[in-house]
């Protein structure tokens, strides 16, 4: 009789702890949705003190990233991976992004490879690996990953940035025509979504257009730049007919 009561009491404590953890995780999720990241971290901590949970550890890491607690975020992503090592693609991806951000490129590549092994259709992971490959000078591999990401993503709020990153990889291969085409797609994407086109964006597009003998296109792109920058370009590119009119327009 006493043994049965003891078992029931223990079971009740376990259930209560699980319910409390779930409540804390739910509060953490709500705080995350409202952008209250430090509050979310507190709730996740309370829940994780009672039980391990992949999603809670992952979200805690993301919240810590948001408030620039990078070392703590890395530990949380590691906890998430430990809680679900065979199904942790997002934890591997975020830890890879963190490694890339902090300059730990080799470890970032290992993690993003694991993320893509578990989820081959993760567009953000494909994009990250493409950027890493570009940084390492493996331009063909970068383009392959970015091609896959673009094919999966289609037209969306991030597709333009995939074109931009692929343009950088094409530049590494000295394929300036493909780079020009991607850069044009990127700027078209920015304008379509009412996003700012920077001086650097126009400069890069103009350089690529000039590299493939599209002087008129380069002229149009560079006209959006400040007068001082246009003067520098005019001195660099020489005295072709188009550039003569470009200088006259300054």
Kindly give the residue locations of the regions a language model identified:
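Canonical tetratricopeptide repeat
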Residues: 59, 93-94, 128, 165, ...
């Amino acid at each position: 009789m006493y043994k049965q009561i003891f078992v029931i009491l223990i079971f009740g404590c376990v259930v209560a702890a699980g319910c409390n953890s779930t409540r804390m995780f739910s509060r953490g999720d709500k705080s995350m949705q409202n952008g209250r990241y430090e509050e979310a971290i507190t709730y996740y901590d309370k829940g994780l003190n009672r039980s391990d949970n992949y999603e809670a550890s992952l979200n805690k890491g993301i919240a810590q990233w948001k408030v620039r607690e990078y070392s703590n975020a890395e530990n949380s992503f590691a906890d998430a991976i430990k809680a679900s090592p065979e199904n942790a693609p997002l934890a591997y991806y975020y830890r890879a992004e963190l490694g890339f951000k902090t300059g730990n490129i080799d470890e970032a590549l290992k993690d993003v490879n694991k993320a893509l092994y578990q989820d081959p259709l993760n567009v953000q992971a494909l994009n990250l690996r493409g950027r890493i490959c570009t940084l390492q000078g493996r331009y063909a591999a970068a383009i392959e990953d970015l091609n896959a990401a673009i094919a999966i993503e289609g037209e969306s709020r991030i597709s333009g940035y995939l074109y931009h990153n692929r343009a950088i990889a094409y530049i590494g291969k000295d394929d300036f025509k493909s780079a020009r085409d991607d850069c044009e797609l990127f700027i078209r994407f920015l304008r379509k979504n009412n996003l700012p086109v920077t001086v650097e964006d126009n400069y890069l597009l103009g350089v690529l257009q000039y590299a493939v003998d599209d002087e008129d296109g380069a002229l149009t792109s560079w006209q959006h730049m400040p007068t001082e920058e246009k003067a520098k370009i005019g001195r660099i590119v020489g005295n072709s007919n188009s550039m003569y009119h470009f200088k006259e327009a300054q």
